[in-house]
């Protein structure tokens, strides 16, 4: 895989591509990373080649109508069947990116009432259905739908990680993505700046380009300063993450564990930059 700094650069470049960037990030980030970091070898062999090639797409189902920031208050439940071989999932998720075309869903549910856990659910599983596409203000080229689960039966091997440890998956994967969100916004800001400069040079008032006026120059200068500061902070944090992960990996920690621990250490910085 690519190092953290390269991923940061890719996120920066893709920033202006709103809908595509949203779809790509939801797939390669929160959609794939739970399997990469917490999946069994069987999970990885089954899903990652197809997800990595783009043959399959992934969606991350965490948010519910009554639980957004308070993700652990989810009401979606998963009950173990009497024979102990399957889980039956019932509940509702909303604002799910990629839902309209996802082949596999990362689904969080409560086992036994209060054991927050994570499951892999494939599209086409009986009882899984989708709501209509949301009428959004922007990123209209990205699929965003509700996902409904009505006694959706999955084999117990579809459990990601351990029962009751779903919060580790949910929050650690989100921690990895926090820096990317900031970088994507930076990339979009750079594109907006290019458009603003072009317009300022083309727009004529009082027989001259408005870019000659001090007020416009001041605004463009302020944008430049803020983008430079943001870029410096984001790429510095990216390097800190990379150095931390590499150090842990060199000392015997697996790649996945090293990246997660590095993300956890710098999660606050990443959240602030986002």
Functional labels for PLM-detected ranges:
Residues 1-26, 38-39, 43, 50-55, ...:
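Alpha-helical interface subdomain recognition
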Residues 2-4, 70-72, 98-102, 140-142, ...:
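Short glycine/proline-enriched turns and hinge-like loops at secondary-structure junctions
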Residues 73, 126-155:
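Flexible, small-/acidic-enriched active-site or ligand-binding loops
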Residues 66-69, 95-98, 110, 136-143:
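Short Gly/Pro-enriched turn/cap motifs at secondary-structure boundaries
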Residues 54-62:
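A short, Trp-centered hydrophobic/proline-enriched beta-strand micro-motif
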Residues 46, 65, 73-79, 94:
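Beta-sandwich/jelly-roll carbohydrate-recognition scaffolds of carbohydrate-active enzymes
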Residues 85-130:
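A short core secondary-structure module
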Residues 151-169:
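Long, acidic (Asp/Glu-rich), low-complexity accessory segments flanking structured domains
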């Amino acid at each position: 895989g690519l190092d953290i700094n390269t991923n940061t650069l890719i996120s920066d470049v893709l920033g202006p591509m709103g809908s595509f960037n949203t779809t790509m990030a939801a797939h390669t980030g929160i959609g794939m990373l739970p399997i990469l970091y917490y999946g069994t070898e069987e999970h990885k062999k089954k899903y990652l080649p197809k997800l990595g090639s783009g043959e399959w797409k992934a969606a991350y189902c965490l948010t519910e109508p009554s639980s957004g920031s308070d993700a652990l208050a989810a009401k979606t439940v998963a009950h173990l069947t009497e024979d102990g071989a399957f889980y039956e999932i019932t509940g509702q998720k909303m604002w799910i990116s990629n839902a309209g075309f996802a082949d596999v869903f990362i689904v969080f549910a409560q086992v036994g009432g209060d054991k927050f856990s994570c499951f892999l659910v494939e599209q086409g599983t009986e009882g899984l259905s989708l709501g209509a596409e949301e009428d959004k203000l922007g990123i209209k080229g990205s699929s965003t739908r509700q996902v409904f689960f009505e006694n959706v039966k999955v084999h117990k091997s579809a459990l990601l990680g351990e029962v009751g440890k779903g919060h580790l998956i949910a929050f650690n994967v989100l921690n990895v993505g926090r820096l990317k969100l900031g970088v994507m916004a930076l990339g979009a800001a750079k594109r907006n700046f290019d458009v603003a400069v072009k317009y300022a040079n083309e727009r004529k008032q009082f027989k001259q380009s408005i870019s000659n006026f001090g007020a416009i120059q001041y605004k463009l200068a302020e944008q430049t300063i803020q983008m430079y500061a943001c870029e410096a902070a984001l790429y510095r944090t990216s390097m800190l993450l990379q150095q931390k992960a590499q150090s842990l990996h060199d000392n015997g920690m697996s790649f996945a564990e090293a990246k997660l621990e590095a993300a956890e250490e710098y999660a606050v910085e990443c959240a602030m930059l986002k």
